[in-house]
Regions:
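Extreme N-terminal starter segment of soluble prokaryotic enzymes
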Residues: 1-3
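Intrinsically disordered, low-complexity linker and terminal regions at domain boundaries
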Residues: 366-370, 375, 380
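Phosphate/Mg2+-binding loops and adjacent switch elements
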Residues: 87-219, 223-226
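C-terminal lobe/tail of nucleotide-utilizing enzymes
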Residues: 168, 178-179, 193-334, 343-347, ...
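Conserved nucleotide-binding/hydrolysis micro-motifs of P-loop NTPases
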Residues: 39-42, 71-74, 136-139, 159, ...
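P-loop NTPase motor core
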Residues: 40-41, 45-102, 109
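Structural motif
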Residues: 319, 340-342, 374-376
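Walker A/P-loop NTP-binding active-site region of P-loop NTPases
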Residues: 5-69, 130, 134-152
Length: 393
């Protein structure tokens, strides 16, 4: 299954372009599912139908299905199940139960529902293409990072090796005077890890790409640069830039002429700066509604499968005595970069984005000897640690 993740600045038309992209693929004969968690059903408005917690077929387009998962229902079900499993702990604390009717979803519930829907769609194997309407770029990249981060937290808080001491838990509990983590907690952690790994597999699959939607102009240019850099930091490949709401030229109106001049400059700069395909979507003069309007947008088709982004390590030991780790970060600015070595991990910060990356095995026996940003690539030099590096005789 191919997956297209659409994001961009708020108000750029992401949901509409997600619907148009899905429509284009479906009319080409690809079984397609388009996902969104927008509470106001912007997806349904664009498609001319009502979407909801169950997938619905789009009338007149046999291969197109739309789905807007209900975060509230799933949140109530999950929290109710958690209360049932944590009965002993809640009783010990004297806590009262929350009834499903009084539960309202917490911030972030929509995003978690979207991740779960992505996993379910991939496991169903019912579709050839999954189009995901993501939140605005900063939230979208944080959302895509969430499965890996949660798995890291689970491994730190509930390491699997602790399960070997199950027989000692009752004794430890009496000594400590508090209940020890029960088997169900470790079982739940293992189940969560499997679910999160399934989402990570979809995000990191070579068939998954990011498409950025932005209006051409100064604000759009800043948003595109940040989005491409942030996506690259997560190891995600951006396959297309979509310039939305492009105005026709020329215009005799001075106000419109000024806007079109700004758009023209951005449309000239983007392909040269990022070496990515640029697809222009015309302004229809009104908000697109229904499949006819979506077809008029002429959304780009699904591109051929791309190769995944690689972070190779090159050997310069013979010449310079170092190994070099190459991390592609297109659009990155030197002043926005920061990196910190913490044990076997590298904490890499680029502007507002941060990622904790495990070091390749060879680099764990080295010390950081320097770094440089050249041609959109961060090159980190590692010198072998004499105390850890194998000695040659």
């Amino acid at each position: 299954m191919r997956t297209i993740l659409l994001t961009g600045p708020g108000g750029s038309g992401r949901t509409t372009l997600a619907a148009a992209t899905a429509l284009t693929a479906a009319r080409d004969g690809t079984p397609t599912l388009v996902l969104s968690t927008d509470r106001t059903d912007t997806l349904g408005a664009a498609l001319g139908i009502q979407t909801g917690p169950n997938p619905v077929s789009v009338p007149g387009t046999p291969h197109l299905t739309a789905w807007r998962p209900d975060a509230a229902d799933r949140f109530r079900a999950d929290l109710t199940a958690f209360q049932e499993r944590a009965t002993n702990v809640l009783d010990f604390l004297g806590a009262s139960r929350l009834d499903p009717e009084e539960l309202t979803p917490l911030p972030g519930a929509e995003e978690l529902a979207l991740l779960r829907a992505v996993r379910d769609a991939a496991l169903s194997e019912a579709y050839g293409l999954l189009v995901v309407d993501l939140p605005p770029t900063p939230q979208a990249l944080a959302l895509l990072a969430l499965p890996d981060e949660l798995r890291r937290y689970l491994r730190r808080l509930l390491p699997a090796e602790r399960q070997a001491a199950r027989a000692l838990r009752p004794v430890l509990g009496r000594l400590a005077g508090v209940p020890m983590p029960a088997d169900w907690l470790y079982d739940a952690a293992a189940r969560w890890d499997v679910e999160l790994a399934a989402v990570t597999a979809v995000v990191q699959d070579p068939g998954t790409v990011v498409r950025l939607v932005a209006e051409p102009g100064p604000a759009g240019t800043d948003a595109v640069r940040a989005a491409i850099t942030g996506a690259a930091l997560r190891g995600l490949r951006t396959d297309t830039l979509i310039a939305n709401r492009v105005l026709p030229e020329p215009s005799i109106d001075p106000w419109l002429a000024s806007i079109t001049a700004q758009q023209r400059k951005a449309l000239e700069d983007w392909p040269q700066t990022y070496a990515l395909p640029l697809h222009q979507v015309p302004h229809l003069g009104h908000d697109p509604r229904g499949t006819d309007d979506l077809a008029a947008l002429r959304a780009p088709a699904v591109n051929a499968a791309t190769t995944p982004i690689e972070w190779p390590v090159t050997d310069h030991l013979a010449d310079d005595g170092v190994l070099v780790w190459h991390i592609p970060l297109p659009g990155a600015i030197r002043d926005d970069l920061d990196l910190v070595r913490r044990g076997d991990d590298l904490v890499l910060t680029v502007g507002p984005f941060r990622r904790i990356v495990p070091l390749p095995s060879a680099l764990r026996r080295c010390t950081v000897a320097g770094a440089a940003l050249r041609e959109g690539e961060l090159r980190i030099r590692f010198a072998p640690d004499p105390d850890l590096w194998p000695q040659t005789r």
